[in-house]
Amino acid sequence: HSETAELVMLLQEEIVFEEYYRCYCIGGKYVRIMPYEPRNPFHLRYVADFSPSQEKLKEMQEIVLRINKYLGYDFNTVELALRDGVPYAIDFCNPAPDADINSVGQENFDWVVETAATYMIEKAQANQPGRDNLTWGEYIKRSSAGAERLMP
């Protein structure tokens, strides 16, 4: 607290984890789950040998999709730490996440570029002129619905 002064911070329990994953989510439907080791030097963070089961991958994908649907982010990363097999969302508000080829690696970079292009084409094709074509998350929808009730 003494170092952040007036900055808004999210206080979280420290999760001493066995596995850690960084998950891209694009368009609220495309998810890439990447083993990630945040304790490694920067250039080696995507060099992690975690191997989740298909069931755990599905659970993590559902968590990532749920968070992004609620926030309404078109592009985000969610970091999940697994402790005793339970995924904890650690960092999940990254609407402009790092996708630099030098940090995420060629394979992950290629996925981001291809998937973002696919999503942008879908959005362009679905565009309805004169209408609100933005992605509004459940958080904003619910908040604005409550604000409407307060208006005279």
Which residues make up each language-model segment?
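Protein kinase-like catalytic core scaffold
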Residues: R32, N76, Y88-D91
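Phosphate-binding site of ATP-dependent enzymes
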Residues: H1-L71
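C-terminal active-site "lid" helix and adjoining low-complexity regulatory extension at the edge
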Residues: L82-P152
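Hydrophobic residue at the +6 position relative to the catalytic HRD Asp in the kinase catalytic loop
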Residues: V78-L80
